[in-house]
Amino acid sequence: MPNRRASRNAYYFFVQEKIPELRRRGLPVARVADAIPYCSADWALLREDEKEKYSEMAREWRAAQGKDSGPSEKQKLVSTPLRRPGMLVPKPSISPPDMSNLSIKSDQALLGGIFYFLNIFSHGELPPHCEQRFLPCEIGCVKYSLQEGIMADFHSFIHPGEIPRGFRFHCQAASDSSHKIPISNFEFGHDQATVLQNLYKFIHPNPGNWPPIYCKSDDRARVNWCLKRMERASEIRQDLELLTVEDLVVGIYQQKFLKEPSKTWVRSLLDVAMWDYSSNTRCKWHEENDILFCALAVCKKIAYCISNSLATLFGIQLTGAHVPLQDYEASNSVTPKMVVLDAGRYQKLRVESPGFCHFNSYNQEQRSNTSTGYYPSGVKISGPHSSVRGRGITRLLESISNSSNNIHRFSSCETSLSPYTPQKDGYKPFSSFS
């Protein structure tokens, strides 16, 4: 990874060739490093003879740079770092860009740093050949700091504009399966120019440098495209720096612990359903209609996840601005509840297990003190006769087994049937056959 710029390999030239195609698809690829995540799958599908073309390009480039000159392979390996030792240093882009932008010098500076989390929803995603890839319909943004939690939030619905011909059903289906915002005649929608102006006022109310904006890496292409589209519609030009939340979390961990966590762990940290239905998380319209997908909720849940994971590491007392306290306290409490999928099997294991011997005598005592009948689990009914039952399928199998056993005993018995004796499970055996 650190030597990628120093030694361009076949994959580098393959990615470089794919950049124009990625830009036509609306992806934010300004350089090769940005395009690498989008090309790995296509590279894996190439045959060896197809990859040879790019390997040849890499060899020609190294020859032009003078890296292939020399009498032996050993001299080539030694001469490269001696000639350009600076290339062995990792690229600045590997560390999250927010760390340099904020000029973090201490934990106190990190705690006081202001972060903006942004998300924009769309009525689906149109095919790559369409000029309009997304139709923005909702925007949410929160102002956050580790010290104060969520300080302010911004939310608005957006008029998506004219639906491209032939894609109305596609857009309606995408809306119905997620945020359920109407694709037309929505009374709460605002024009894109007004929404963008209000967003800029929220993010940058005072003169000075514009703060960086963060969103999830999976949403970055859509959010960036929608911002550019809204800028063209409103004729307002502001080059917002759109970064990823994953890089922000990695940077905070690096600053605090001098270690870099894996991106997989960071994504699992942010993708939780703990606060999906928490109060004051979704916008008013989605809350009233009981709809889970909301752009504002995505931003707030990012803040909740960061607070839950990072704020305590800095000794910060969590408040209602950091996480929904009622849900946070409930999640940390232990509920004495157990779900048993096969009650009959579980009861059998408990009786046979030596660790539950004292429960065995207790259960027998309870059987003699409870009445016959079916009652919900956990309900105790006093009565003369009762038996502990399993699930319905368990009782059915037991009855079939008992019936077959009784028939077998009847056919093989030469003497008269013994007097009726109640069975342990409450079922009567066959006493006569017609």
Curated annotation (Swiss-Prot):
Entry keyword set: Cytoplasm, Developmental protein, Differentiation, DNA-binding, Meiosis, Nucleus, RNA-binding, RNA-mediated gene silencing, Spermatogenesis
DNA-binding region, residue intervals: 4-73
Molecular-function GO term, any one: RNA binding
Effect of disrupting the coding gene: Mice are viable but show profound defect in synapsis of homologous chromosomes in male meiosis, piRNA production defects, DNA demethylation of LINE-1 (L1) transposable elements and a 100-fold increase in L1 expression in the adult testis. In the adult testes, L1 transposon derepression occurs at the onset of meiosis. As a result, spermatocytes are flooded with L1 ribonucleoproteins (RNPs) that accumulates in large cytoplasmic enclaves and nuclei. Spermatocytes with nuclear L1 RNPs exhibit massive DNA damage and severe chromosome asynapsis.
Any one annotated GO CC term: chromatoid body
Location(s), subcellular: Cytoplasm; Nucleus
Example of a GO biological process term: DNA damage response
Pfam families from the UniProt entry: HMG_box_2 (PF09011), Maelstrom (PF13017)
Tissue expression notes: Testis-specific. Present in spermatocytes and round and early elongating spermatids.
Family: Belongs to the maelstrom family.
Function (record text): Plays a central role during spermatogenesis by repressing transposable elements and preventing their mobilization, which is essential for the germline integrity. Acts via the piRNA metabolic process, which mediates the repression of transposable elements during meiosis by forming complexes composed of piRNAs and Piwi proteins and governs the methylation and subsequent repression of transposons. Its association with piP-bodies suggests a participation in the secondary piRNAs metabolic process. Required for the localization of germ-cell factors to the meiotic nuage.
Subunit note: Interacts with SMARCB1, SIN3B and DDX4. Interacts with piRNA-associated proteins TDRD1, PIWIL1 and PIWIL2. Interacts with Tex19.1 and, probably, Tex19.2.
Protein name: Protein maelstrom homolog
Biological source species: Mus musculus (Mouse)
Taxonomy of the source species: Eukaryota, Metazoa, Chordata, Craniata, Vertebrata
